[in-house]
A protein has these predicted regions:
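C-terminal nucleotide
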Residues: 1-45, 53, 66-100, 195-263
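A short glycine/serine-rich beta->alpha loop
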Residues: 31-32, 51-54, 92-100, 129-137, ...
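Acidic, glycine-rich active-site loops and adjacent beta-strand->loop/helix elements
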Residues: 41-42, 73, 83-86, 128-134, ...
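DPxDG-like acidic metal-binding loop motif
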Residues: 60, 137-157
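Helix-rich "cap/lid" substructures immediately adjacent to catalytic or cofactor-binding pockets
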Residues: 98-132
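Phosphate-handling active-site elements
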Residues: 116-125, 151-167
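Alpha/beta catalytic cores of group-transfer enzymes, especially the acyltransferase/condensing modules
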Residues: 158-206
Length: 263
């Protein structure tokens, strides 16, 4: 809770962070320049509502994506994953126009989208790891945000929270090919410890609602079904279209202005 994706972690407070740093030391025989962390999120209410510009809420949890990293001034990105066998390696100046089809598409997309607005000259070497099984907690958004935060730090780029959210969303929409809304990115960037995020995805106004002192203690249970999935290649985009069609029909039958379906 409470950690910002843009903040360098000075002390390695969890086993996952420590494992990431140890692997970096073993690989590169040096200390990392920093560790970028982005939490996973849970969504009590709002799934499939954000891409229809509705109101959602969410919580960040104290598990997520860690990247132990150091600068590479030759412009190379070289990232090993503790969760996937293949190492990502590419030049920041030569990102393919189309996705390749592996987990590193999230990194390539982050460079491509960020480079449209800012000069990216410094790459990075590092180790990335994700606590908990992949899928269901917005790990893809967390990978993009934690990587983008590290890349920004090394290239002296400062992003506001809203800009980071929108850029990370563009990576998923325009490069990876997932027609997601902004629920995942907003929860992972805006949430704070002991607060519930309430967000209107139409106008981006939000409120962080603190836990009431009179509220009884609670715990959040997350169950793993044994199945791992990726939104890419799933029927997520079709579900988004179905929600859009349903909302359009409801507006029409209720007598409201419904305009053109494409809008």
């Amino acid at each position: 809770y409470g950690k910002r994706a843009m903040v360098k972690v000075e002390k390695f407070g969890t086993m996952n962070e420590l494992e990431c740093v140890i692997k970096f030391n073993q690989t590169y025989r040096r200390e990392p320049d920093g560790v970028s962390f982005c939490p996973y999120r849970i969504c009590p209410l709002g799934a499939h509502i954000d891409h229809q510009y509705g109101k959602i809420n969410g919580l960040a949890i104290n598990y997520g994506i860690n990247i132990a990293y150091a600068a590479k001034h030759n412009g190379v990105v070289e990232l090993s994953s503790l969760n996937f066998p293949k190492r990502a390696q590419f030049y920041v100046s030569a990102v393919p126009e189309e996705k390749v089809g592996d987990w590193a598409d999230h990194l390539r997309g982050a460079v491509k989208i960020l480079a449209e607005l800012y000069p990216i000259r410094v790459g990075l070497c590092g180790v990335i790891e994700g606590s908990l099984p992949i899928g269901g907690l917005s790990s893809s958004a967390a990978v993009i945000i934690s990587f983008m935060a590290a890349l920004c730090r090394l290239n002296n780029i400062t992003l506001q929270e809203t800009e980071l959210i929108l850029l990370a969303k563009r990576v998923e929409n325009e490069y990876v090919g997932v027609s997601c809304g902004k629920l995942d990115q907003s929860c992972e960037v805006l949430c704070r410890k002991d607060h519930l995020l309430y967000l209107d995805t139409k106008d981006d106004t939000y409120e962080l609602i603190p836990t009431s002192p009179s509220m009884k203690p609670y715990k959040i249970a997350i169950f793993f079904s044994g199945l791992e999935r990726s939104l890419v290649g799933s029927k997520y985009n079709m579900r988004q279209d179905e929600c859009k069609a349903a909302a359009y029909a409801l507006q029409a039958f209720s007598g409201q202005e419904y305009g053109k379906f494409a809008d």
